Amino acid sequence: MTIAIGQEKTRGGFDLVDDWLKRDRFVFVGWSGLLLFPCAYLAVGGWLTGTTFVTSWYTHGLASSYLEGCNFLTAAVSTPANSMGHSLLFLWGPEAQGDFTRWCQIGGLWAFIALHGSFGLIGFCLRQFEIARLVGLRPYNAIAFSGPIAVFVSVFLMYPLGQASWFFAPSLGVAAIFRFLLFLQGFHNWTLNPFHMMGVAGILGGALLCAIHGATVQNTLFEDGDAADTFRAFTPTQSEETYSMVTANRFWSQIFGVAFSNKRWLHFFMLFVPVTGLWTSAFGIVGLALNLRAYDFVSQELRAAEDPEFETFYTKNILLNEGIRSWMAAQDQPHENFIFPEEVLPRGNAL
């Protein structure tokens, strides 16, 4: 008889931390959680602080701000002034010099939220990838979430980096985002940009595919033993199908003449369309950051300048963009000291 005496492998600090992070608990932490949870907490907390405590001039907290009329649709964390350039505006930096009130006033909170928000989104993407690896799934959820990350980073970081300062990024708020969209249209003719068109096609196409798919599955559910189509008729561990792909295929073949006959191809297409739309939009925003022009029909502009009777969709678009610029520029770029005569500014409900 042979007796082998083995010595237990010593476990280092990394192994102990790895075990603790990946322990089975109600909310999985993981290595990605070290990036996700602090950054998400600070970004959300920073936004709530900026839209309540700071906008009330440091007199109200979260609850009392909303009780006394704070509107989350119009409140926003404003971008730094143009004079700040692309400084990261650290609280301890030369601009704020450790003064929290001064830091908030110069826009440090915006940079804080934008950077922590970006890293928080990346952490959430890594979280999906990490959990997928641990449970043996493919990483397509993480790949899909790269689309929203690309849009956020391109709009809030890449665009202002290509411009003069953080000032040209959108402020962090609902109404502020819509104002930024007007800015993109007036100064970049964004709606006539092919990357924007591909983005719209991807997002609306994804919504259409989602609606069609959900309705089709609901239409072709198998009945349970009581001849009823209830949600109780499904269990996650059942081996049989819960709806009829054959019936769905026949239905759409009659509607369109063609239909998906392969579930794998169908669901990949539902992944591909919106994610591609998000990525193309992000590419387009990077182009705007570099002031690349798209669909400027110079020949039409020249003819319109010579012939007052010449009018096309594009020449009307030029007038719209000029109106947006004259309306926004004076208040949106006060550092430029624009002065427009009263007769050229839009009045009333002109826009």
Swiss-Prot record:
InterPro entries: D1/D2 (IPR055266), Photo_II_D1/D2_sf (IPR036854), Photo_RC_L/M (IPR000484), Photo_RC_L/M_CS (IPR055265), PSII_PsbD/D2 (IPR005868)
First-tier enzyme category under EC: oxidoreductase
UniProt-annotated location(s): Plastid, Chloroplast thylakoid membrane
Reaction equation(s) it catalyzes: 2 a plastoquinone + 4 hnu + 2 H2O = 2 a plastoquinol + O2
Gene Ontology terms: cellular component: chloroplast thylakoid membrane; photosystem II
Transmembrane segment boundaries: 39-59, 123-139, 151-164, 206-226, 277-293
Coiled-coil ranges from the UniProt annotation: none
Binding site for chlorophyll a PD2: 196
GO biological process entries: photosynthetic electron transport in photosystem II
GO function terms (MF aspect): chlorophyll binding; electron transporter, transferring electrons within the cyclic electron transport pathway of photosynthesis activity; iron ion binding; oxidoreductase activity
Pfam families associated with the record: Photo_RC
Membrane topology summary: Multi-pass membrane protein
Entry's EC annotation: 1.10.3.9
Listed Gene3D superfamilies: Photosystem II protein D1-like
Name recorded for this polypeptide: Photosystem II D2 protein
Source species: Porphyra purpurea
Name of the gene: psbD
